Amino acid sequence: MSKTKCALFDLDGTLVNTIDDLAGACEILIKKYNFDAHWTKEDYLNFVGNGAKKLVERAFNETLDEITLNERYEEFKPLYDKIKLDHAHAYDGIKEQLDVLKGMGIKLCVVTNKPNVAAVGMVEHIFGKNYFDCIIGCIDGIPTKPDPTSTFNALKKVGCKPSEAIFFGDSEVDMRTAKNAGIEAVGCSWGFRSFEILFAEHPSVIIDEPKYISKLF
């Protein structure tokens, strides 16, 4: 990993803890429609990772037809947008580690399944504008992770090869994204998935605290 020039990060569950606001928006929506569900925080931790539309689908227990799901998803977006920063915060030690990487000349990228506008807004609010070299969220017409397209787009933007990058993520989706892109995968077990789920994906290494990030460079 000594030749690494780029660090790619998932957003939700890796850089930023967003679960309370994601769950909150879903709860508002399912209560509006009197949907009989009593989800726990642990449930929502398992629902996230494949984008907001999939989150809504899982919150309604995958009972919605495609037309209704699209309608609910369109309702979810402004609900979440209103509260997305109420509780969201960077995990302890993340900013310090990112500063170390920047000092080493490492390119920093965010590759997330969160809608692009929401992703850019959140990252800039928490870390500052232009802190990251590249932020790529979910964009219509571009497949979401674990498809590697967004990851390849990020690498192209910063002028790096897959062999020069490490992908940090907290879920099986991220580990598969890295594998599909031919990139070293590092599991972050402080996020939304368990160590066991990450381990089953055979990443290069699993770290349980952000303080270990810079030690991989």
Label for each model-derived stretch:
Residues 32-37, 62-67, 103-104, 127-131, ...:
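Short helix-capping segments at alpha-helix termini
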Residues 1-46:
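Active-site neighborhood of HAD-like aspartate-dependent phosphohydrolases
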Residues 26-30, 48, 52, 56, ...:
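Hydrophobic alpha-helical core bundles mediating ligand binding, dimerization, or RNAP-core interactions
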Residues 8-10, 111, 168:
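Generic enzyme active-site microenvironment
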Residues 1-5, 102, 116, 120-217:
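Asp-based, Mg2+/Mn2+-dependent phosphohydrolase catalytic module
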Residues 32-63, 92:
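Alpha-helical substrate-recognition element adjacent to the catalytic core
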Residues 57-96, 104-106:
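Metal-dependent phosphoesterase signature
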Residues 26, 94-124:
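Substrate-recognition element of Asp-dependent hydrolases with the DxDx(T/V) motif
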